[in-house]
Each structure stands twice: as structure tokens, then as C-alpha cells.
Curated annotation (Swiss-Prot):
GO biological process, one term: protein modification process
EC number: 6.3.1.20
Keywords noted in UniProt: ATP-binding, Cytoplasm, Ligase, Nucleotide-binding
Role summary: Catalyzes both the ATP-dependent activation of exogenously supplied lipoate to lipoyl-AMP and the transfer of the activated lipoyl onto the lipoyl domains of lipoate-dependent enzymes.
Residues binding ATP, per UniProt: 70, 75-78, 129
Gene3D superfamilies: Bira Bifunctional Protein, Domain 2 (3.30.930.10), CO dehydrogenase flavoprotein, C-terminal domain (3.30.390.50)
Top-level EC class as recorded in UniProt: ligase
Name of the protein in question: Lipoate-protein ligase A
Subcellular location: Cytoplasm
Other information: In the transfer reaction, the free carboxyl group of lipoic acid is attached via an amide linkage to the epsilon-amino group of a specific lysine residue of lipoyl domains of lipoate-dependent enzymes.
One GO CC term, this protein: cytoplasm
Length: 339
């Protein structure tokens, strides 16, 4: 069995998550792989989560915060350069989740931090959570990835997660928040580089003690890797694609209601694969044509404020006599989507 160590110099989350998939799907069946990486400001959601439930999409767009959807399950997390992320990839027959946690705990001990496992997924120092993990398994391989809070901006956890309730009745997984702490609270000198070095050392030591050897070099990955590895570029394009980040959202219903001076609008949008598949509007408005036009305009549109605004603008041009009412509905719906 061989050891492989990769470290990303790129902070684009789509690149790093694509690298995970690339390694996972091209894994040498005779190797244990460690991948270390960190992201610029990003909300990463689990494979089965709804970004409109978990995130403040509009604020993220305004602040140039990435949205990424990972292949594995679990809850929504906020990443910035104060997070260090680790991924262990192994052949399924030789996968040892306990060993992975042991390596991280041993690395933290090298830095004077006593951590332990909390439940199945988390690590903590005292009663403070400092790491969460998620897992993925196929017939012949497994991976375990997690985040270590080094010096993350805790304020921004609240800035981009947990939006204003929109009456979204989602079928996906709702994240559970926990008390968390940064590792710098326990060692003020720790940073991404010192932690990465400690994890690499602990990884080599663990497998040296089990006769795998400790000579694995560190492979540095950067943007040039996309050009050198066509398969990696393919995974990158998928991670960056709107249809993956939004379109893979579980089915949900958005129900909102308001009163305009021309009537009540009770709007129900059934959203599947991030597109509005069914529109139901109850209204006491006198103009029945307006209600029919609104339903027709929203049907099969992406659940995206820019696409919805474009459809309403198109409807305005086609029916200028209804412009005031159309504008009312457009501003209201988009405002509700923004939270």
C-alpha cells in the first residue's frame, strides 16, 4: 500500500471540491491519500440540501461569496481562509475512519491541543466543537473529509447562513448548529501552514508505524493542474455549474401571500431541480387575465431572481396596460426570495 499527499495552493472551492472528486474517482487501489486545502469565503452545502433554506443567496452574491455543493451529505458550513480542510481517501477494504480521526488528533497534539472525538462526525476541545466531518462510500473506495476551524470569522457564520424564513417546506436536510471555537483560542501561533505540516507529519507517522513507509512527497496542486489533467477540468466544470449548485436541490414549495390595493395574491410555487414546475395562485383580483398571465410567466422558469425578473419584464412589454400590477408582483416576489 502506498501513501499519497496532495496540498492545494488554490482557494477556489469549486477547484478543491473537484479535486476531491477527481482523486476519489481515479484513486490508485493500492494507496491511502491525504488532501489538504482551504477555500476563500464560501458556503458549502451537503448533497441533499436546499441553498434557499440554508443560505442568504442575495447577500452572498453581493459580497462575492461562493456557493458550493459537495458530493457527500451533511449540513451547511461556512469556509474562509481561517479553515483548514482535510480529505482522506482509501480503498474501501482498507478504509479506517478511526485511523483518520486519530491522525488529526495526533496532529493537534503536536501543536499542544488536546482534542477528542465527539459523536460520529465531530471533534472537540473541551466542550467546543473545532471540526466536523462528512463521508462518502462506493463499492470499492471511501472518503472522509472534514473542516478544522483555525481562525475562521465566526461572525460570518451568521451573515450567510440561516436566512429569514420564507415558508419553504423543504424535503432536504436542515443543518444543526453547534457551539464552535477556533484553534487559535488554544494555540495563538497556529495557522494553516503549521497545521498542514502537523497533519502531514502525523499521517506519515501513523502509516510508518503500520509498515506503509513515510517517504511520500507532497504534491502541490494549482490552477495549471486543470490544463494538465482534462478529467480534473471536467469535475471543475461540474462543481462550478449552476445546475449542480442549485439544480440538485430537493423538491420544495415556496408559499407567500400579500395584499395589494388591487387584490390579494396567495402564491404557491412548486420547485423541482431548481425550476418552477407548478404555479398556483389564489386571488380576489378582478382581472382574471392578470392571474393567468402571472401563472404562465412563472411556469418552468429557473428559481432565480434574475430569470424571474427577466420574465416579468418580458410580460410588462407584452402587456403595458398591466404594468403597475406586474411590477407590484415582481418586486414583492423577488424581495421575498432575497429574505
Amino acid at each position: 500500500m502506498k501513501l499519497r499527499i496532495l496540498k492545494s495552493a488554490v482557494t477556489n472551492p469549486w477547484f478543491n471540491l473537484a479535486t476531491e472528486d477527481w482523486i476519489f474517482n481515479t484513486l490508485n487501489p493500492d494507496s491511502h491519500t491525504l488532501f489538504l486545502w482551504r477555500n476563500s469565503e464560501t458556503v458549502v452545502i451537503g448533497r441533499s440540501q436546499n441553498p434557499w433554506v440554508e443560505c442568504k443567496i442575495d447577500k452572498m452574491e453581493a459580497d462575492d461569496v461562493f456557493l458550493a455543493r459537495r458530493q457527500s451529505g451533511g449540513g451547511a458550513v461556512f469556509h474562509d481562509l481561517g479553515n483548514t480542510n482535510f480529505t482522506f481517501l482509501s480503498p474501501k477494504d482498507d478504509y479506517d475512519q478511526a485511523a483518520n480521526f486519530t491522525i488529526i488528533i495526533n496532529a493537534l497534539k503536536k501543536l499542544g491541543i488536546d482534542a477528542d472525538l465527539s459523536g460520529r462526525n465531530d471533534m472537540q476541545v473541551g466542550d467546543k466543537k473545532i471540526s466536523g466531518s462528512a463521508f462518502k462510500h462506493t463499492a470499492d473506495r471511501s472518503f472522509h473529509h472534514g473542516t478544522l476551524l483555525v481562525n475562521a470569522n465566526m461572525q460570518k457564520l451568521g451573515d450567510y447562513l440561516n436566512p429569514h424564513p420564507l415558508k419553504l417546506k423543504a424535503k432536504g436536510i436542515k443543518s444543526v448548529r453547534a457551539r464552535v471555537a477556533n484553534l487559535v483560542e488554544f494555540n495563538e501561533d497556529i495557522n494553516h501552514e503549521t497545521l498542514s505540516d502537523a497533519i502531514i507529519e502525523a499521517f506519515r507517522e501513523y502509516y510508518r508505524d503500520t509498515d506503509y513507509g513515510d517517504t511520500a512527497p507532497v504534491e502541490e496542486l494549482d490552477e495549471a493542474s486543470l490544463a494538465k489533467q482534462p478529467n480534473l477540468n471536467k469535475y471543475y466544470q461540474q462543481m462550478a455549474d449552476w445546475d449542480w449548485r442549485f439544480g440538485k436541490t430537493p423538491e420544495f414549495t415556496h408559499h407567500i401571500e400579500t395584499r395589494f390595493n388591487w387584490g390579494i395574491i396567495d402564491l404557491h410555487l412548486d420547485v423541482k431541480q431548481a425550476a418552477i414546475r407548478e404555479v398556483v395562485i389564489f386571488s380576489d383580483a378582478l382581472n382574471v387575465e392578470l392571474i393567468d398571465l402571472l401563472k404562465e410567466s412563472l411556469a418552468d422558469v429557473k428559481y432565480d431572481k434574475h430569470d424571474i425578473k427577466a420574465k416579468f419584464d418580458e410580460l410588462n412589454r407584452a402587456h403595458p396596460e398591466l404594468a403597475a400590477q406586474i411590477d407590484d408582483v415582481s418586486e414583492w416576489l423577488i424581495g421575498e426570495m432575497e429574505g
